[in-house]
Regions:
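ATP-binding glycine-rich phosphate-binding loop
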Residues: 72-125
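Short coil/turn segments at secondary-structure boundaries
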Residues: 117, 130, 134, 178-182, ...
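Conserved kinase catalytic-core helix
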Residues: 152-153, 238-268, 272, 278-282
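ATP-binding glycine-rich loop module of kinase domains
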Residues: 112-174
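Arg/Lys-rich, intrinsically disordered low-complexity tails that mediate electrostatic binding
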Residues: 1-49, 54
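Catalytic activation segment of kinase domains across protein kinase-like and atypical kinase folds
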Residues: 271-356
Length: 453
């Protein structure tokens, strides 16, 4: 209904004292003349909407209380894999950038790329992720790394604690947006487009094509543990381990995983910079129990959760299928120039993403052992590693009894060292445990987070 006009008129009138101005007002007939505002009676729809809003606030508050009860620090639980699904659900699988409170560059641009740390906050609960970017078109293609990461999430993450989760694949809107991010200390989220899974497929045809045109424009969002150090930091003297045996426990966690997946997985870029160490809580340890091939258990206490990162060169069970699909949309020159050279036989440095190699991932053991930074490794066998970045495969276990020839030999050597140390060590009652983790390799790991009890 149209409102009547509101106007002010002015006319003069005579008085005994002279002429005065008289104001008259014609107002909207629907407007009340009293000072009290008209109160609108709530409708059923308004009451229902208000009730829904209050329920949403109440549910969010309850979710925060529940999360803080079972996991005061999200990073600790994510490291263990404890309550991980609840945390991901609460933060909308980390794909909603409206929940990001802040972003910052971690380190400088290197040959490996550049990384942003994203801090997510919702109702006084915080968690972190990292956005990994390529440094140039020749760097390892992040579309393939995303595919490997999703495969690891599906096949291995419930069984082994040493892996990080991959959250999502993104693409910059254009080359300039990528260049701006490369030069900036903060991230502009409006320049990123999420590439969702469609019809059960991790990536689609358009993504394959884009990855061969300009691989720089893709980036991946992964799990992040704030405050981690790398094994490389320890080797360079920037950080120190809690005791001499820790290095043996760290290597055991890595090679136990590699042993169990050796037929279907090879990392192909396993060095000290790609092994992260997370100490969940100062002064507390994690009690690990691992089931060996003979059914026996081996146990030890460590201050660290170990994480293996950078999956851009890995061999996985579906690598051959990926390569065949890639060949349908990318020419050989693009495959070589856009970060896919590891699919070419025989492969540089004995790297071939199409086939496993049970010796190649000894690179980590070789570098750590020969660094002379860890006294606890001095008595362990050396390994056969023919060049700095790779080695040919030795399939036969214990082929050279005085040397380690493959990851099975390596795990056996580390197991023997831990068992011998356990016999000679004196048990103390003062150790405070933060969690118990039991790993069998053929069943989901069992996690007991003592702080949640």
């Amino acid at each position: 209904m149209a409102r009547k006009s509101f106007r002010v008129t002015m006319r003069k009138r005579k008085t005994s004292g002279g002429t005065k101005e008289k104001f008259t007002r014609k107002t909207n007939t629907n407007v009340r003349t009293n000072t009290k505002a008209k109160t609108k009676t709530p409708t059923a729809e308004m009451r229902a909407r208000h009730k829904q809003q209050m329920k949403k606030v109440s549910d969010e508050a309850a979710a925060v209380i529940a999360l803080k009860t079972i996991c005061a620090d999200s990073g600790v639980c994510i490291a263990f894999g404890y309550a991980q699904d609840k945390i991901k659900t609460y933060f909308k699988r980390f794909l909603d950038f409206r929940l990001v409170q802040s972003s910052r560059r971690i380190g400088e641009v290197s040959v490996n790329g550049f990384v942003f740390e994203l801090a997510y906050k919702r109702k006084h609960y915080t968690s972190y992720a990292v956005l990994k970017n390529s440094a140039n078109q020749g760097a390892d293609n992040l579309v393939y790394e995303y595919v490997v990461g999703k495969y690891i999430d599906l096949e291995y993450s419930k069984y082994f604690p040493c892996l990080i989760e991959t959250y999502g694949l993104f693409r910059y809107t254009n080359v300039q947006a990528y260049e701006n991010a490369k030069q900036s200390s903060k991230l502009e989220f409006k320049s990123l487009v999420h590439i969702p899974e469609r019809n059960g497929a991790v990536i689609d045809v358009d993504t394959f094509k884009w990855s061969c045109i300009d691989s720089r424009q893709h980036c991946i969002l992964t799990q992040h543990l704030k405050g981690v150090i790398s094994l490389g930091d320890v080797m360079s003297g920037k950080a120190r381990l809690k005791n001499e045996m820790e290095i043996v426990y760290i290597l055991f966690q890595v090679y136990y995983f590699l042993f169990h997946v050796r037929k279907d997985f090879t990392h192909y870029d396993l060095h000290e910079g790609n092994v992260l160490l997370f100490e969940p809580e100062k002064g507390k340890k994690i009690k690990y129990k691992y089931k060996l091939s003979d059914g026996k258990l081996i146990s030890f206490e460590s201050a660290y959760v170990v994480k293996i990162i950078d999956y851009g060169r890995c061999h996985i069970k579906m690598s051959d299928k990926f390569y065949k699909t890639l060949g349908m949309y990318c020419n050989p020159n693009q495959i070589n120039s856009q970060g896919y050279p590891w699919f070419n036989k025989p492969g540089m440095y004995h790297i071939n993403a199409l086939e496993p190699n049970v010796s190649h991932d000894l690179r980590l053991y070789s570098r750590v052992k020969t660094s002379n930074a860890f006294p606890a490794l001095q008595t362990l066998k050396p390994c056969i590693y023919t060049c700095e970045f790779g080695t040919s495969e030795i399939q036969t276990n214990n082929k050279y009894p005085q040397y380690i020839g493959n990851i099975t030999d390596c795990l056996n050597e580390l197991t023997t060292t831990i068992q011998q140390n356990s016999k000679g060590s004196i048990k103390t009652q003062n150790t405070i445990h933060l969690a118990h983790i039991q790993v069998s390799g053929d069943a989901p790991m069992r996690i007991r987070y003592l702080k949640a009890e």
